[in-house]
Amino acid sequence: MIIKPKVRGFICTTTHPLGCERNVAEQIATTRANIPESERDKGPKNVLVIGASSGYGLAARVTAAFGYGASTLGVFFEKPGTEKKPGTAGWYNAAAFDKFAKAEGLYSKAINGDAFSHEAREKAIELIKQDMGQIDLVVYSLASPVRKLPDSGELKRSALKPIGETYTATAIDTNKDAIVEASVEPATEEEIADTVTVMGGEDWELWVDALDKAGVLAPGARSVAFSYIGTEITWPIYWHGALGKAKEDLDRAAGELDARLGQHGGGANVAVLKSVVTQASAAIPVMPLYISMVYKVMKEQGLHEGTIDQLNRLYRERLYSTQGQNGELATDEAGRLRLDDWELRDDVQQACQDLWPQVTTENLFTLTDYAGYKREFLKLFGFERDDVDYEADVDPVAEFDVVQL
């Protein structure tokens, strides 16, 4: 079929299989350029990525496999394509990853199902025992609006809302490319609690606990989960909002898991990453405008990093750095690995603060990198690539080495 982008709200409802494959190939090429052959043996060897099909989770898997030659098992929840309808971008990303990894002679296997379920954990443990033995890195990168509690089956939903008072700010209506005033009502106590349940550290702990009890964690195994803190511009909706409470719970879990894994010479950390265009960030009010501003400023200063650049740096300069003194990782006072350091530079943030009140619908494309934001957004779904002929017929069915739960 011939597939064109169809955007509804902050989701593109169509995806392009070849475009997604080229995106993954590009991440692999970047990784090879960033991580020298001489450092290949310094990284992880057997890696489990929970939330492995898009965004930072996909980049974590690409970095492990193509930067360090690791065997990888990916867990995600995606929809396969059919003859009549394209699948989700994550499905095609995972299919492309599998194809490229196998061509390289690397072990690659995936589980498609609810990563919050006990069943997913059991299947992962079974595959690790059968194929990998033990794993030395567990990457936790789930971003989901809903979590089905594994014991009761109860559904909990996360809320992207402020706490205490209504938050009103300048934002972009991405459907109309217009600057609007966006207001978000504050979260109720129940919504805050549910957001912590969905996006907090509980499920990360359940995963590490299950892996540990099953004996599939290698001595010295590490685990990392991803977070974002941001700055004053996004704090009301993010760090000081319901989502921030969930991310604080992630910090709590990291402390518990660090103590547990530390008994065998390993450890756990939250990695705080920079803001990038992902399906997750597109859903957060104010983020598209903030990202459009910060991309422009950081590109002008030669500091811009995409998703894969961040993950390459996380592995190379933080998790597996040769600079680490006696195995100590360079963290902030809360034990977090900070990769938002360039974004949080005073000059970068001041430039964004100065830009923010000036942006109007008329100057949106000139004052900010909103054009770049839109392009990156569509690229997530396989569109806007110069090396793909979008008038050509493409097969929406992609089969690969995946266990369907």
Swiss-Prot record:
Its EC number is 1.3.1.9. It is an enzyme of class 1 (oxidoreductase). The record marks 78 as: Plays an important role in discriminating NADH against NADPH. The active site is at 238 (proton donor). Substrate binds at residue 228. One of its GO terms (biological process) is fatty acid biosynthetic process. Keywords: Fatty acid biosynthesis, Fatty acid metabolism, Lipid biosynthesis, Lipid metabolism, NAD, Oxidoreductase. The keyword Cytoplasm does not apply. NAD(+) binds at residues 51-56, 77-78, 114-115, 142-143, 247, 276-278. Pathway: Lipid metabolism; fatty acid biosynthesis. It catalyses: a 2,3-saturated acyl-[ACP] + NAD(+) = a (2E)-enoyl-[ACP] + NADH + H(+). GO terms for molecular function: enoyl-[acyl-carrier-protein] reductase (NADH) activity; NAD binding; trans-2-enoyl-CoA reductase (NADH) activity. Belongs to the TER reductase family. Monomer. Involved in the final reduction of the elongation cycle of fatty acid synthesis (FAS II). Catalyzes the reduction of a carbon-carbon double bond in an enoyl moiety that is covalently linked to an acyl carrier protein (ACP). This is Enoyl-[acyl-carrier-protein] reductase [NADH].
